């Protein structure tokens, strides 16, 4: 693995949530049901994001339209941009012979953004683990979306999957969490100060969910050595976002893997000032000739 120096820019839910046909009451719902408007249920941004991915299961195009800003910006390069394109995707999945399933594992919120870790199976095509980031506008509508997806894989050398592990989120200073993770990504993953590697870990205490790497700093070192022997380099060129909620932070970066343009979404849990646990999704960047929108991955 070659760690490459370059430029940089710099919640979970307590339970796994199976997203089905989520039914949050609007003003009109309450009114028609004979309830007082004052009893209207106000959705949080996290609930709105979960409701939106829930429309893949329910086929509820009206709900999708309600949640999305008209000028919705899509960064998943397999889909067109705009609210209409999203609604068309919901309609298409609803008509598929095999029902889509959506299983949210962790959900976080940071300012105007919500970030989710979810297992999808779109129309029976196979399970994929994904990270989604949604940006909300001033009116509370979902205005922009980024994501990274990878096929669900077998447990790694330490027996961990891409989604298991700690679910509890601690109420700690998210800015301190962001600072630690941003520092690690810059110093270690982008290679700006590689000698600081061990300072980010509490000895060998490190739970790893990457599909090919074992637990501990020792497991990471062994994996990097094996990659180097195979001539495989993993390069992080630029980090676009570091989102934090409690003791968790998600870093969204781009670079190359084995010389191929790749996007990296890395979720870290921080404990006592050290990186304690890591989940990730790597996705090969699609050739521009295949893009369904011109917004770019970031």
Predicted regions and their residues:
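C-terminal and inter-domain tail/linker signature
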Residues: 2-8, 12-298
């Amino acid at each position: 693995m070659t760690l490459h120096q370059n430029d940089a820019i710099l919640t979970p839910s307590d339970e796994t949530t199976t997203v089905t046909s989520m039914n949050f009451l609007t003003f009109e719902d309450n009114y028609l049901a004979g309830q007082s408007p004052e009893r209207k249920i106000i959705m949080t941004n996290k609930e709105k994001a979960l409701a939106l991915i829930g429309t893949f299961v329910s086929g509820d195009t009206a709900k999708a339209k309600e949640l999305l800003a008209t000028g919705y910006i899509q960064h998943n390069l397999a889909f067109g941009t705009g609210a209409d394109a999203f609604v068309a995707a919901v309609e298409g999945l609803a008509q598929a012979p095999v029902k889509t399933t959506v299983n949210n594992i962790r959900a976080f919120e940071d300012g105007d953004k919500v970030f989710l870790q979810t297992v999808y199976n779109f129309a029976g095509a196979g399970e994929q683990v994904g990270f989604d980031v949604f940006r909300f506008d001033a009116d509370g509508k979902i205005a922009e979306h980024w994501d990274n997806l990878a096929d669900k894989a077998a447990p790694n050398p330490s027996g961990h999957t891409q989604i298991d592990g700690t679910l509890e989120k601690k109420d700690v200073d998210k800015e301190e969490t962001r600072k630690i993770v941003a520092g690690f990504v810059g110093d270690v993953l982008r290679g700006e100060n590689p000698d600081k590697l061990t300072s980010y870990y509490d000895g060998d205490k490190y739970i790893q969910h990457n599909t090919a790497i074992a637990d501990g700093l020792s497991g990471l070192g062994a994996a990097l050595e094996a990659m180097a022997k195979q001539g495989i380099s993993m390069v992080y060129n630029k980090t676009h976002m570091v989102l934090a909620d409690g003791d968790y932070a998600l870093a969204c970066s781009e670079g190359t893997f084995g010389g191929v343009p790749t996007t990296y979404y890395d979720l870290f849990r921080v404990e006592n000032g050290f990186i304690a646990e890591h989940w990730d999704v790597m996705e090969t960047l699609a050739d521009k000739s295949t893009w369904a929108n011109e917004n770019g991955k970031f």
